[in-house]
């Protein structure tokens, strides 16, 4: 069966569990790097509760879930920023699934979702400590650019043109 990627409601149990895992990992990594500790549990809960994922709901966005042999193991989101630009966000795979090719499949699914939303380019931001993410994006043809936002947690910004040939958009 292998890897599959499909649309998921942001409020599904699967999506909520993946959002919690993603947020916990990126928050803990930031705090460990900058303050030498994991995220305070109360702060972690506030952060998780602080995003309902509304920006990832059609028609302006889409949440995708990666599954391996049917088991949900990762996610990615896209949201329209303007008529031709979408942002890639929440790209995540459980640690035990990394290095198995799923990240490339997940990002390809997100690129297809962005095309389906009408985007001709996809932008994203990431942090310096997320070295593996930066390597992935460069390997997949993303180019480092000037900042497209003022996120406190962003150190690197990337962009990729989404070539859309007639009839090339796949349903997700």
Question: What do these predicted ranges mean?
Answer:
Residues 70, 101, 118:
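Conserved G/P- and acidic residue-centered "switch" motifs that form tight phosphate/ATP-binding loops
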Residues 120-172:
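C-terminal "cap" of GNAT-fold acetyltransferases
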């Amino acid at each position: 069966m292998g890897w599959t990627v499909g649309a998921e409601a942001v409020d599904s149990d699967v999506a909520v569990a993946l959002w919690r895992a993603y947020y916990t990992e990126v928050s803990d990594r930031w705090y460990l790097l900058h303050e030498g500790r994991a995220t305070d549990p109360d702060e972690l809960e506030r952060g998780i509760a602080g995003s309902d994922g509304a920006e990832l709901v059609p028609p302006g966005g889409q949440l995708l879930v990666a599954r391996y042999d049917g088991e949900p193991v990762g996610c990615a989101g896209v949201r329209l920023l303007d008529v031709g630009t979408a942002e890639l966000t929440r790209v995540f795979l459980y640690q035990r699934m990394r290095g198995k090719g799923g990240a490339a499949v997940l990002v390809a699914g997100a690129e297809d979702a962005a095309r389906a939303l009408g985007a001709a380019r996809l932008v994203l931001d990431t942090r310096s400590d997320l070295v593996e993410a930066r390597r992935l994006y460069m390997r997949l043809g993303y180019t480092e650019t000037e900042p497209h936002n003022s996120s406190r947690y962003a150190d690197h910004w990337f962009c990729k043109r989404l070539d859309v040939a007639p009839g090339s958009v796949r349903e997700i």
